[in-house]
C-alpha cells in the first residue's frame, strides 16, 4: 500500500486488489471535531461520494469503478485510472478535449449533479477517454432553482480560474469549454453563465 495523495479530508493509497491496481480512499478523523459528529460527517460524505459517482456513471460520465466501500470505516476502494490529467494536457498545448469536458460537465449539471472540485487534476484522459474523479465535495440537487444555478456556476468557476492561467490561450480554452457546455445544457446554460458572470464581477471566487 503506497500513499499517493494526502489532502485535508482524505488520504489516497495505491493498493493491490487481487492482482489489480486499485485506489483506496480513506477519510481520516479530524481531531478538532467532536468524535461522534466527525464520524457522522465522514460517513455521510463517503456514502454521498459513492452515490454521486453512481449517478455520473448512469448519465454517461466516465468515473472510476467502485469495487467496494465501507461507510463505517469511511473507505472507498475503486479503480485506478492511469492517464494524464487535463492540467498536464493543457500544459502541452493539447486543448482539443475541452469541448468534451464542457459536454460532460453539462451532463452532470443537467442531472442536478454538482461535482464540487472541477480542478483540471480531477479530469483524467485514459486510453482516449475522459474520466472525472474525486466527487468528495459533490452534491445532487433536485429541481431547477437559482440556488442550483449558483452552485453550478461555482462548480464551473473553479475550472475557469485554472484555464485563465494559460495566458493568451485562455480565451480560446474557455470558448471551447463553453461550446460543449451550451450544447449539452441548452437554454439553461445562459442562466448558469449569468451566475458565473455575477460571481466573477463581484470578485467572489468561491473555493469549495
Cite the ranges covered by each PLM segment.
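Residue-level recognition of conserved beta-strand positions in structured domain cores
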Residues: 17, 26-28, 36, 68, ...
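Conserved kinase catalytic-core helix
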Residues: 55-61, 87-121, 126, 130, ...
Amino acid at each position: 500500500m503506497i500513499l499517493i495523495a494526502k489532502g485535508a479530508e482524505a488520504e489516497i493509497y495505491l493498493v493491490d486488489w487481487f492482482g489489480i491496481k486499485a485506489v483506496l480512499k480513506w477519510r481520516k478523523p479530524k481531531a478538532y471535531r467532536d468524535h461522534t459528529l466527525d464520524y457522522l460527517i465522514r460517513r455521510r460524505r463517503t456514502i454521498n461520494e459513492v452515490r454521486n459517482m453512481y449517478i455520473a456513471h448512469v448519465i454517461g460520465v466516465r468515473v472510476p469503478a467502485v469495487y467496494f466501500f465501507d461507510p463505517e470505516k469511511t473507505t472507498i476502494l475503486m479503480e485506478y485510472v492511469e492517464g494524464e490529467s487535463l492540467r498536464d494536457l493543457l500544459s502541452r498545448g493539447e486543448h482539443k478535449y475541452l469541448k468534451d469536458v464542457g459536454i460532460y460537465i453539462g451532463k452532470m449539471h443537467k442531472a442536478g449533479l454538482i461535482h464540487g472540485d472541477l480542478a483540471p487534476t480531477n479530469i483524467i484522459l485514459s486510453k482516449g477517454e475522459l474520466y472525472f474523479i474525486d466527487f468528495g465535495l459533490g452534491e445532487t440537487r433536485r429541481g431547477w432553482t437559482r440556488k442550483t444555478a449558483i452552485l453550478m456556476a461555482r462548480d464551473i468557476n473553479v475550472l475557469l480560474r485554472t484555464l485563465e492561467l494559460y495566458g493568451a490561450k485562455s480565451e480560446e480554452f474557455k470558448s471551447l469549454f463553453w461550446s460543449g457546455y451550451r450544447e449539452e445544457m441548452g437554454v439553461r446554460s445562459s442562466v448558469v453563465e449569468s451566475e458565473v458572470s455575477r460571481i466573477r464581477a463581484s470578485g467572489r471566487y468561491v473555493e469549495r
